[in-house]
């Protein structure tokens, strides 16, 4: 099991970091008391989940020895990593000024600069135990997310989850579609009485469409389009991309083309899922 403890200066980007790690599949818990972390890891270990816990200055024990004991109490089979987000004071002051949020320690009768210095002192034991220290002073949110992905995965590229779906225009365009391709101009198996009851998943329909040059040409051009633009979409920090292929009823052509495009994307090493939005409607009415 992997346990990542995320801490750092207030305003250094811990919330951004948690969102980025959640996108990577980690179970994230914000501001958990230090004493509860062992109980949480025991529970999640049974579920085979890796976890990220965020610690801020309010959840730390006053005695540094207690922190030391907790950090060294985890069993050896738990892979523990402590990441500390650092940031220069002038950048923290600017961020708090821009956001107009209160610092967690602002109840003290101190200026913001003095509160930041106090927090630095209180966080020093965590800083000393950190496996990785990331200075976020000049990072944008995207750059921090990329840094974390590079640190944990060995690559700054975010994995893009791609969904290829077929649909029928008669039922409406799927609301979640990022790209919509219209294949109603392709030869239609519907006009073949033997093929009409079948779907684009069945061999006679597949054979029919495989023999149409227009179908191959469309798939080839669409694959070329995706090959050019998918890398740029991945660099844009997207988590999901939905490609919708539509024909009249969502039964033959769109189903066949969606399957072909999904296999092509999969052959490029991408994570892809296929769903056929309108087939269920046909099964219900048949």
From Swiss-Prot:
InterPro entries recorded: P-loop_NTPase, RapZ-like, RapZ-like_N, RapZ_C
One Pfam match: RapZ-like_N
Q: Which Gene3D superfamilies match?
A: P-loop containing nucleotide triphosphate hydrolases
Record keywords, A-Z: ATP-binding, GTP-binding, Nucleotide-binding
GO MF terms listed in the record are:
ATP binding; GTP binding
Q: Give the function comment from the record.
A: Displays ATPase and GTPase activities.
**Record-stated family:** Belongs to the RapZ-like family.
Q: What is this protein called?
A: Nucleotide-binding protein HAPS_0087
What organism, scientifically named, is this protein from? Glaesserella parasuis serovar 5 (strain SH0165)
């Amino acid at each position: 099991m992997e346990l990542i403890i995320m801490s750092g200066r207030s305003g250094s980007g811990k919330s951004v970091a948690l969102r980025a790690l959640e996108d990577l599949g980690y179970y994230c818990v914000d501001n958990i008391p230090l004493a509860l972390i062992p109980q949480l890891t025991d529970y999640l270990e049974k579920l085979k989940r890796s976890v990220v816990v965020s610690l801020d200055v309010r959840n730390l024990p006053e005695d540094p020895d207690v922190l030391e004991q907790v950090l060294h109490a985890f069993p050896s089979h738990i892979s523990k990593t402590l990441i500390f987000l650092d940031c220069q004071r002038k950048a923290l002051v600017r961020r708090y000024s821009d956001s107009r949020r209160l610092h967690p320690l602002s109840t003290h009768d101190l200026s913001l600069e003095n509160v930041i210095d106090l927090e630095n002192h209180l966080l020093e034991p965590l800083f000393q135990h950190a496996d990785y220290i990331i200075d976020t002073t000049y990072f944008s949110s995207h750059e921090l997310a990329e840094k974390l992905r590079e640190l944990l995965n060995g690559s700054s590229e975010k994995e893009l989850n791609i969904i290829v779906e077929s649909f029928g225009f008669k039922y409406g365009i799927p609301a979640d579609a990022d790209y919509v391709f219209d294949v109603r101009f392709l030869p239609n198996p519907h006009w073949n009485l033997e093929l009409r009851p079948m779907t684009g998943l069945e061999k006679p329909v597949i054979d029919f469409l495989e023999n149409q040059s227009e179908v191959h040409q469309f798939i080839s051009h669409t694959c070329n389009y995706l090959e050019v633009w998918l890398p740029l979409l991945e660099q844009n920090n997207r988590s999901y991309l939905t490609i919708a292929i539509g024909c009249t009823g969502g039964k033959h052509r769109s189903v066949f083309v969606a399957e072909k495009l999904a296999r092509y994307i999969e052959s490029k090493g991408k994570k892809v899922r296929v769903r056929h939005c309108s087939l269920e409607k046909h099964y219900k009415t048949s």
